C-alpha cells in the first residue's frame, strides 16, 4: 500500500451554504450540455461556443478555462466570473495491492468525501459519493458514523469522475473510466435531482459517453423514489441494499425499513421492473450469525421468487468497522452454505469479489479515520498554544 497526503484544514463543524461562502463559484460540470448552450447564448455567444467548451471539458478534459485555446479572452473572463472547473482538492490517495485506489477529496467548504477506483476484468469502475455523511442509519456501515451535512452538487459528483480520469490521462496509457457505480457515501435517492443530472451528464454521447448499461445506482430502499426513477427513462442499472429477508431483522439493522418495509419496497421494485423491463440487483452484506443463517437464505429465495427472472443477488463479504465491533464477517463456510441454499432454489447470485482489503476498505472508513486525525491534531495544536501562553 502506498499513501500520499497533503496538508489541509480540519473539516469545519459549522455548516455554511455554499452559495453564501465568500468567493464561491459553482462547478461548470454541474451544467447539462443544453444548459451550457443556453448560458452561452444568454451571455452573447453562439451555440457552437458552448459545444467547444463542452469538448474541452469532457473530451480534452482540461482543468482550467485558460487552457481553452479557441475561446476568446472575453468569454473566458465571463466563465471565470461565474464558474470554476473542478471544485475538489485531493487530500489522500490510498493504493491497494490489487490495483484499487481510494481517494479522499476536500470540497470547497472543507468537507470530505471518498471516491474509489476498482480494476475489474471488464475495465475501470469508479464508485462515487453523493452526500457528505448519511442519515439512513444502517447499523453496520461506516458512512453513517457521521450524519448528513449536505448534498453534493451535480458538479461535485461529476468532478469525482473527472479527477480519477485525469490520473489516467496524465499517465498516457489510454485507459478510461468505463463503468460507474453510485454506491459511495450517502443515499443517492435522497439527493435525487443532482444524481439524475449527474447521470445524464456522464451518459451524454458528446461527453464522457459512459453507457447507461455501465452505470449502476444503489439505493437503501426509498420506495417512492424507486417508482419515480422508473419513469425517468434513464436506462441505468438499479441496485437495492437489502441485507435482510424479513422486516424484523431488516428494521434492526437498517432504520429505513421502518419507513419503507419490505412490502412497500417490493411493490416499488415490481413497478420498476414492469415499467423498465430492467433487472434489479440486490446487495446482501454477510454479517456473521446475524443474517447469514440457512433459514435466512431460504427466506431470501422466497422473498425474491416472484421477480426471479429479473433479479440478481450479490453476497458481499463484510468489511469490519471498529465503531461497529458487534458485527463481524461471515465465515467462508457460512457464506458457502448460504450460497448453496440460494442456488438450490434457482436464485441468480454470486459472492462479490473483494477490493482494497489492505486499505481503509469499508465505505466511509477513510473519511472517518481522517476526520479523527484532523480533530486530534486540532486539539493537540490548541492545547500546545494554551500551554505556551
From Swiss-Prot:
Recorded superkingdom: Bacteria
Protein name: Probable dual-specificity RNA methyltransferase RlmN
Coiled-coil stretches: none
Cited function: Specifically methylates position 2 of adenine 2503 in 23S rRNA and position 2 of adenine 37 in tRNAs.
Pfam families named among the record's database cross-references: Radical_SAM, RlmN_N
Cofactor(s) for this UniProt protein: [4Fe-4S] cluster
Broad class of enzyme this protein falls into: transferase
Any Gene Ontology CC annotation: cytoplasm
Note: Reaction proceeds by a ping-pong mechanism involving intermediate methylation of a conserved cysteine residue.
EC number annotated for this UniProt entry: 2.1.1.192
Any one GO molecular-function label of the UniProt entry: tRNA (adenine(37)-C2)-methyltransferase activity
Domain Radical SAM core: 120-358
Amino acid at each position: 500500500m502506498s499513501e500520499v497526503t497533503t496538508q489541509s484544514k480540519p473539516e469545519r463543524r459549522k455548516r455554511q451554504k455554499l452559495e453564501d461562502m465568500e468567493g464561491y463559484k459553482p462547478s461548470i460540470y454541474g451544467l447539462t450540455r443544453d444548459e451550457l448552450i443556453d448560458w452561452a447564448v444568454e451571455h452573447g455567444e453562439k451555440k457552437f461556443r458552448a459545444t467547444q467548451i463542452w469538448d474541452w471539458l469532457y473530451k480534452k478534459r482540461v482543468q482550467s478555462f485558460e487552457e481553452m485555446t479557441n475561446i476568446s479572452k472575453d468569454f473566458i473572463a465571463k466563465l471565470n466570473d461565474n464558474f470554476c472547473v473542478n471544485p475538489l482538492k485531493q487530500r489522500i490517495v490510498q493504493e491497494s495491492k490489487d490495483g484499487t485506489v481510494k481517494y479522499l477529496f476536500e470540497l470547497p467548504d472543507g468537507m470530505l468525501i471518498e471516491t474509489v477506483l476498482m480494476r475489474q476484468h471488464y475495465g475501470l469502475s469508479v464508485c462515487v459519493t453523493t452526500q457528505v455523511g448519511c442519515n439512513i442509519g444502517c447499523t453496520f456501515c461506516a458512512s453513517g458514523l457521521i450524519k448528513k451535512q449536505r448534498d453534493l452538487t451535480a458538479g461535485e459528483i461529476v468532478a469525482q469522475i473527472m479527477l480519477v480520469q485525469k490520473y489516467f490521462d496524465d499517465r498516457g496509457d489510454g485507459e478510461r473510466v468505463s463503468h460507474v457505480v453510485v454506491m459511495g457515501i450517502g443515499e443517492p435517492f435522497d439527493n435525487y435531482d443532482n444524481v439524475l443530472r449527474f447521470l445524464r451528464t456522464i451518459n451524454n454521447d458528446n461527453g464522457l459517453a459512459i453507457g447507461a448499461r455501465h452505470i449502476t445506482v444503489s439505493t437503501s430502499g426509498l420506495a417512492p423514489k424507486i417508482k419515480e426513477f422508473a419513469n425517468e427513462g434513464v436506462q441505468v442499472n438499479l441496485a437495492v441494499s437489502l441485507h435482510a429477508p424479513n422486516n424484523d431483522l431488516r428494521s434492526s439493522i437498517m432504520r429505513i425499513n421502518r419507513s419503507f418495509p419490505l412490502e412497500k419496497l417490493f411493490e416499488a421494485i415490481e413497478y420498476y421492473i414492469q415499467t423498465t423491463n430492467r433487472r434489479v440487483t440486490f446487495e446482501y452484506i454477510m454479517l456473521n450469525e446475524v443474517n447469514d443463517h440457512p433459514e435466512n437464505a431460504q427466506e431470501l429465495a422466497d422473498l425474491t421468487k416472484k421477480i426471479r427472472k429479473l433479479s440478481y443477488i450479490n453476497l458481499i463479504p463484510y468489511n469490519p468497522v471498529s465503531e461497529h465491533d458487534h458485527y463481524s464477517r461471515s465465515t467462508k463456510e457460512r457464506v458457502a452454505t448460504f450460497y448453496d441454499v440460494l442456488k438450490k432454489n434457482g436464485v441468480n447470485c454470486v459472492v462479490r469479489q473483494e477490493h482494497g482489503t489492505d486499505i481503509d476498505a469499508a465505505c466511509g472508513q477513510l473519511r472517518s479515520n481522517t476526520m479523527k486525525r484532523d480533530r486530534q491534531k486540532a486539539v493537540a495544536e490548541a492545547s500546545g498554544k494554551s500551554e505556551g501562553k
